[in-house]
Each structure stands twice: as structure tokens, then as C-alpha cells.
Amino acid sequence: MQAEKLAYYPFISEASAHVGDLGISLESLLNSRAYRTARARGIERVKEALEGEIKKPPVSEEAQVLSELLSYPFARMLVACVDDQLFTRRYALAEAKAAYTFLRNETPDFLLEFGEDFGISAEIRDSHFSMHFTDYIRFSNSLKEPSWKLTNRQFRAGKIKITKEEFARLLEEAVRERIEQSFPIPEIPPEVSAFCAPYVAEIKEQFEVQKKKFGATDFGAVEPELFPPCISHALANVQGGVNLAHSMRFAMTSFLLNVGMSVEEILNLFNVSPDFDAEKTLYQIEHIAGATGNEYKPPACDTMRTYGNCIGKDGLCAKISHPLGYYERRIFLKNKEREKEEGKEKGNEEKKEKREEHEKKNEKGNEIKEK
């Protein structure tokens, strides 16, 4: 693949190998004036991701290609230093969406080669693509439009029939997954952390503004840190701009309504989704909230397991049969612990008062003796 093409897809194996062959050291990438443009582009790349769209201008000259290629590893350094799961999801989604704008215009043969880098085996038949159903399920699972459901697909001999544009859309999901799963980076070199610190501080500040804008942290009296793992995972996906399967979307929305979040607060959560439709989403939330006369409860744990939505089970999950029961139990345990701590503090205060009273009596006794 030509270097110009690799610059548009810096996350594929061939692009990584190409950058490695250039022999540019980490110290040079961080400090050399020769790569100042690449660093600036890396910073721009991350900031654009926060806004939801990474713009990729055409590159033709060798210097432009090099700058675009090297901006990706530097951007990854910044994301690693920010070290925030929601931030990582937003970044991965933006990179994947940027890739899709180019993938949809590539030739079928190019898309097949691109898919192989992600372990996706497909073939061209007549005017469509054919891919194994396991790959299809893996990468279409987060796409909530009914047309992506397996029941709405032509299925023969373990293969699914899809269009060229649909195949490109699934490749977008593969890109998002690869980038997202490449974080966190276990050990960040100290020199990288030190160099990136001022840029990371600026990016974090911008990120906080974004979170407030989308209501990602405004849960009022609701305590999200006590949510069951399945709901926490769904929330992280939504706030990262990842589409949920319909069953998980219903489960999360009904759960949040039942624990006290308002329709408006939940609507703000979905506002980061790539295909956000405010009117449609509002209708769905209000329907679950009971605007049509039927108020819905979230599904029980057995149902969550049936639909593949039981994720990240912990010790408490084994004793609970419903997500709301999990939340109620966590609140009970937290209140019990708080009462215990308050009891300790009260006991310590009483002991302190008795000790002070005893000391005063001793002081009076000593004064009498002295007289």
C-alpha cells in the first residue's frame, strides 16, 4: 500500500510497520524540530476527536504524509496520558468515523484487503459482499438499526449478504474496537508523561467542558458508582458515543428512569451518539417512562443474560436477580457503612467528652489540694 494511503489508515499493521521502518526514535518524535508539525497535528487530532470529527485533509507531498503518519502515535501518547475510559471511547469512535469517510469510497478489493488486517474473511459475489456470520455479529452488535438484525439478513451456508457500503460500515466498527482495546497502555515512559503534561492538562479541561455540555456526569441524587456492572458498561458505551443494541438500550433507559433520573437527563446522555435523533430518542424515553400509560421496569438478570447484556458480573451479582435489586442492595450497604462510621465518630466524641470531664475533675481536685 502506498504511503499516502497509509496516512489515512495509520492504525493498520502495514502503517505501523512503515513507521517502524523509518527508524525515528521516541526522543526525536518528542523533541526534534523536524517533527514539530507532526506533534501539532497529533494534538489537533485529539482535540478534534473531542468535538466528534477528525478532519483529514488530502496529503500528497512527502512531508505531509510523514506528518500525518507520525501524528497518530503522538495522539495515542496523549490519549494514554489522559487515561480516561470515556475519553478513550470518544477518541476511538472519532478515528473510526474518519476512516469510514474514506473506506466507503475505496474499491471492493481494497476493502477485502483492509478487512483481512482485522481478521475478517469476506468475498465478493456479483454486486455484493459475503462474510461469515460470526464476523457479522461481532461488528454489527452495537448497531441498533433494525436492518442490522440477523433476522433481517440473507443467511446461507453460514454467510451473510451485505452491500459494499455496509461492509465499510462494519470495518468502521472493527477500527473502533481495535483502537479502543489498545488502551490503557500499561507503562508510559516518564519522558512521555513529562512532555505531554501541558497538552494533557489542556485536553482534560476541554474534555470536562464537553462532559458538562452533554450531561455525562450530572446524575443529581442518583449514585452511578453503585450501578450494577451491566448498566455501568452500557453507560460507558453511550457516553463514548457507541450505539447500544436495542435490548440494552431499553434495559439501561428503564433502569435510569426507575432510579430517579429525568427524561431530560437521559436524553442528554444519548446526545453523544453518532446517529443521535433527538425527537426519536425523546419519544422512546417517554414511552418507557410511561407517557403512553405503561411504565416499564428494567428486565431481570435472567433476561439480561438471554440477550447477552449481562456483562462484568461481580460477587454481589451472584446474590441478586434484578439490576434494581443490585442498586438497592449497594445503597443499603453504603448507608449501613455510613451509620457504622457515624456510630464510631459518636462513640469517639463521647469518649473525648468523658476524658475532658475527667481531666477537669482532676484539675479541680489538684487546685483544692494546693489550697
Swiss-Prot record:
GO cellular component terms? primosome complex
Chain residue ranges for the region called Disordered: 337-371
Required cofactors, per record? Answer: [4Fe-4S] cluster
Sorted alphabetically, the Gene Ontology BP terms of this entry are: DNA replication initiation; DNA replication, synthesis of primer
* Record flagged with keyword Iron: yes
Q: Where does [4Fe-4S] cluster bind?
A: 230, 301, 310, 317
Q: How is the cofactor bound?
A: Binds 1 [4Fe-4S] cluster.
Iron among the record's keywords? yes
A GO MF label: DNA-directed RNA polymerase activity
Give the highest taxon in the source lineage: Archaea
Where in the sequence is the signal peptide annotated?
none
Q: How does it assemble?
A: Heterodimer of a small subunit (PriS) and a large subunit (PriL).
**Family recorded in the similarity comment:** Belongs to the eukaryotic-type primase large subunit family.
- Annotated HAMAP family: DNA_primase_lrg_arc
Q: What does this chain do?
A: Regulatory subunit of DNA primase, an RNA polymerase that catalyzes the synthesis of short RNA molecules used as primers for DNA polymerase during DNA replication. Stabilizes and modulates the activity of the small subunit, increasing the rate of DNA synthesis, and conferring RNA synthesis capability. The DNA polymerase activity may enable DNA primase to also catalyze primer extension after primer synthesis. May also play a role in DNA repair.
NCBIfam families noted in UniProt: PRK02249.1-2
List the protein's name.
DNA primase large subunit PriL
Species name for this entry? Methanosarcina acetivorans (strain ATCC 35395 / DSM 2834 / JCM 12185 / C2A)
